[in-house]
Amino acid sequence: MNIIINMLGFNIFIETVYKFSDHTMERYHPYQRAPWSASIFKKNYNNVKVASYVEIPYTTNNADVEITYTTNAPSRPESKARRRLDFTNMTPLPCCIDDGSFAKPLL
């Protein structure tokens, strides 16, 4: 009886890790239930959709011509560590002058 229950549990595990609906045996990540190609261990961005640009279709009076404008945005957002600060347009930070009021003894 234990063997049957164990085999049933293993079957359920296998069915959750592998897709049996189509017979391609596509590998799934066991924790995220995402396709294995989108795993965090493989740096693969094929299945990651980044909505960082907007396409606006624009039609002129001529019905044969259709122009699509795309905003100038990167295909992938740049990580925070690689962004560079623009010091030319930065507002100066307020300078805090210590007049001794910060070092008052607690009464």
From Swiss-Prot:
Pfam families: DUF5501. It comes from the Viruses. This is Uncharacterized 12.4 kDa protein in IE1-IEN intergenic region.
